[in-house]
Structures are given as structure tokens and as C-alpha cells.
């Protein structure tokens, strides 16, 4: 099933996107720097900021979703 139509899959995709963007920004900060922060190209930068500022919550959500996927 497509991840857009399944809420659990959509959450997994969003969490993986946030974690990936945060990792990329930590390793290669110049990759996510864009001039127009309000366009679609600024979305990975915003996801990286969310991942940095809410890292305990994002990691807890990743852990919960991983266990949910494993046992479901």
C-alpha cells in the first residue's frame, strides 16, 4: 500500500525523513543550506532543525514506531 494512504507508513516515512535530514546536516551542513527558506527546497532544512531541537522526542517516536512495526 502507498505510504500516503496508510497512516502508520506515513509516520514511518516522516520520521525517517527527519532522521536522515538531521544526519546529513550534522555530517555535511553545506548540503542543506538554501537561500529561500520558505520554498519546497527548504523542507529538508526544516526537517533537520526539527530533528535537532526535538531529538529526544524524535528518537522516542522512532523507537516506538520500530517496536510497533516489529510486533504488528
UniProtKB/Swiss-Prot annotation:
Keywords of this entry: Golgi apparatus, Membrane, Signal, Transmembrane, Transmembrane helix
InterPro entries: KISH_domain (IPR051523), Ksh1 (IPR009653)
Gene Ontology CC annotation, any one: Golgi membrane
Membrane-protein topology: Single-pass type I membrane protein
Cytoplasmic side: 69-72
Pfam families linked to this entry: DUF1242
Coiled coil segments of this chain: none
Function: Involved in the early part of the secretory pathway.
Full protein name: Protein kish
Gene: tmem167
